[in-house]
Amino acid sequence: MTKYAKIIGTGSYLPPRRVTNHELAAQLAEKGIETSDEWIVSRSGISARHWAEPDVTSSTLAVKAAEQAIEAAGIDRQDIDLIIVATSTPDFVFPSTACIVQEKLGITNHCPAFDLQAVCSGFVYALATADKFIRSGSHRNVLVIGTEVFSRILDFNDRTTCVLFGDGAGAVVLSASDEPGILSSAMHSDGSHVDILCVPGNVAGGNITGNPFLHMDGQAVFKLAVNVLDKVAREAMEAASVSPDQVDWLIPHQANIRIMQGTAKKLGLPAERMVATVHEHGNTSAASIPLALDVAVRDGRIRPGHTVLMEGVGGGFTWGAVLLRM
């Protein structure tokens, strides 16, 4: 049985179109909806987000991020023996986006590929799942991707949500290792909070029934998020006998700078040890954590041997944390 699972490569991709708060405010003003850069930044910390063009799907973004991660890992793509894609905006109802990614990457070894849906907690759930596959000894190189095109499900008549979300993808290659990698993970859910963050529309007979756009009770999400993120982060640290002062970097889900700062403060972690990309990426749901990870790896902040705490919270309500050593 394999002892550890370790990240050996990271990658990310953002659609070229960057939409600033000023540009978005001008677009919304044409619809009679008032907002401003100051209003958005003060409530979320977001200054810009990237949105995909109409012909771009989650798999398109995922493949770009995956190619970077595989190159960084220095392995042949045919050595990937499992693909897990975390997404809430799949290309189709079925087949899975993971299968589409497999084909687009030219991986012909018939490895299993499946999607995992836990909204903004998706990447944490997927990484923890991949870790279990590797530790069981059944797989050696798992491609884990978070990818979203949330711009497709935004209600542009609701200024409280349409200004928050962006599109993008992040990926890692998680491989069997004799060195410590994933140290611990913790995951939870509470279905009694389904209604506070959801897309209530349904697909039946090829038609959408109900509201096809994202709905969020921001205040309820904020209250729950800060509470559960602190608890699940401590749960993961305690499982690995790691204290907050031993954590080099915190990578929270990039949803809202106030939630992120509140969580870091409760954990006793200084702001300079938190990776924050929300100002430039917006909330990219399952893509936010791997996007932030790749940014910090490539700019040299996160280096081999660093201890990294990732935590996410999303619709469901779902939440989770992964503690790892790079």
UniProtKB/Swiss-Prot annotation:
Gene3D superfamilies according to UniProt: 3.40.47.10
Catalytic function, reaction form: malonyl-[ACP] + acetyl-CoA + H(+) = 3-oxobutanoyl-[ACP] + CO2 + CoA
Coiled-coil annotated spans: none
Region spans: ACP-binding: 254-258
Transmembrane segments: none
SUPFAM superfamilies in the cross-refs: Thiolase-like
Keyword terms: Acyltransferase, Cytoplasm, Fatty acid biosynthesis, Fatty acid metabolism, Lipid biosynthesis, Lipid metabolism, Multifunctional enzyme, Transferase
Pfam families, per database record: ACP_syn_III, ACP_syn_III_C
Pathway(s) it belongs to: Lipid metabolism; fatty acid biosynthesis
GO biological process: fatty acid biosynthetic process; secondary metabolite biosynthetic process
Location in or out of the cell: Cytoplasm
Gene Ontology CC: cytoplasm
GO MF annotations in UniProt: 3-oxoacyl-[acyl-carrier-protein] synthase activity; beta-ketoacyl-acyl-carrier-protein synthase III activity
InterPro entries in the cross-refs: ACP_syn_III_C, ACP_syn_III_N, FabH, Thiolase-like
Domain of life: Bacteria
Active-site annotation: C120, H253, N283
EC number(s) reported in the record: 2.3.1.180
Function comment: Catalyzes the condensation reaction of fatty acid synthesis by the addition to an acyl acceptor of two carbons from malonyl-ACP. Catalyzes the first condensation reaction which initiates fatty acid synthesis and may therefore play a role in governing the total rate of fatty acid production. Possesses both acetoacetyl-ACP synthase and acetyl transacylase activities. Its substrate specificity determines the biosynthesis of branched-chain and/or straight-chain of fatty acids.
PANTHER family (alphabetical): 3-OXOACYL-[ACYL-CARRIER-PROTEIN] SYNTHASE 3 (PTHR34069), BETA-KETOACYL-[ACYL-CARRIER-PROTEIN] SYNTHASE III (PTHR34069:SF2)
Domain notes: The last Arg residue of the ACP-binding site is essential for the weak association between ACP/AcpP and FabH.
Family membership noted in the UniProt record: Belongs to the thiolase-like superfamily. FabH family.
Assembly information from the UniProt record: Homodimer.
Name used for this protein in its record: Beta-ketoacyl-[acyl-carrier-protein] synthase III
Organism: Cupriavidus taiwanensis (strain DSM 17343 / BCRC 17206 / CCUG 44338 / CIP 107171 / LMG 19424 / R1)
Lineage, broadest ranks: Bacteria, Pseudomonadati, Pseudomonadota, Betaproteobacteria, Burkholderiales
Encoding gene, per UniProt annotation: fabH
